Amino acid sequence: MILVLDAGNTNMVLGLYEDKNLIADWRLSTDPLRTADEYSIQVIQLFLQSNLRLEDVEGVIVSSVVPNIMYSVEHMVAKYFKKKPIIVGPGTKTGINIKYDNPKEVGADRIVNAVAAHEIYKKPLVIIDFGTATTFCAVTQSGDYLGGAIAPGVKISSEALFEKAAKLPRVELMKPSSVICKNTVSSMQAGMTYGYGGLVDHIVSKIKQELMDSGEKEPLVVATGGLAKLISEESETIDIIHPFLTLEGLRIIYEKNKDLDA
């Protein structure tokens, strides 16, 4: 079995693969102050609840956009899984060509998503990841990662309203039945859900046009991340939701690098 781990700014997502099959997935909160032993308590408990054994894990791969968490994660893997994890970063074999001005600036999660989508769909792509930030990535059919756009995430936008506007409350992210709302909570929810659908469609339309102007066929638009389903209901451009795109990308990258890391 292969353990894949993606550490984002808000959540850490873990997946366990047997061959190409995802047999378990879990989500933990990301906390840079948590020690390797504290993370291990949670991970061991998750394994036990799923009737899985740590010693059956043959390899581990990690991607992270939170540098301060890596010491604890690497030591947790070394101490409790007795493995040296593959870390997605410069020098990792991915199978895509990064055309960024400075490739080191590209978040590991964006690279991993691009690897998965390119491998699965074999088409020009626009990839949207609804995380702490909402990222948009453009990938050619041949596997060139061209770059993209970054917008504030839906949740942090909602939190900013709560923190900066004295009379606006913290609200649950859900779609009201109408965009013409008659109370503050529903009005904020309408702005977040209906508004983000418009943001997504406008950025995606621009990226698709630039890709096609460069000679690519019409791109497939793939969305992932915790809020992909909610926002896609108000988007006219999203073609596919792949909830485990990042985990799948980590599995693919592991297969490309496991012998190199031996």
Swiss-Prot record:
In terms of domain of life, where is this protein from? Bacteria
**Which pathway does UniProt place it in?**
Cofactor biosynthesis; coenzyme A biosynthesis; CoA from (R)-pantothenate: step 1/5
Supply the EC number(s). Answer: 2.7.1.33
- NAD as a keyword? no
Protein location: Cytoplasm
This protein's cofactor list reads:
NH4(+); K(+)
Q: How is the cofactor bound?
A: A monovalent cation. Ammonium or potassium.
> Record-annotated residues binding substrate?
Y100, G107, A108, D109, R110, T184
Per UniProt, where does K(+) bind?
D129
Q: Which GO terms describe its biological process?
A: coenzyme A biosynthetic process
**UniProt-annotated catalytic positions:** D109
GO molecular function terms noted in the UniProt entry: ATP binding; metal ion binding; pantothenate kinase activity
Q: Which residues bind ATP?
A: D6, A7, G8, N9, T10, N11, M12, V13, T132
Family to which the UniProt record says this protein belongs: Belongs to the type III pantothenate kinase family.
Instruction: Give the protein's function.
Output: Catalyzes the phosphorylation of pantothenate (Pan), the first step in CoA biosynthesis.
Q: What is this protein called?
A: Type III pantothenate kinase
User: Whose protein is this, by species?
Assistant: Clostridium tetani (strain Massachusetts / E88)
* Underlying gene: coaX
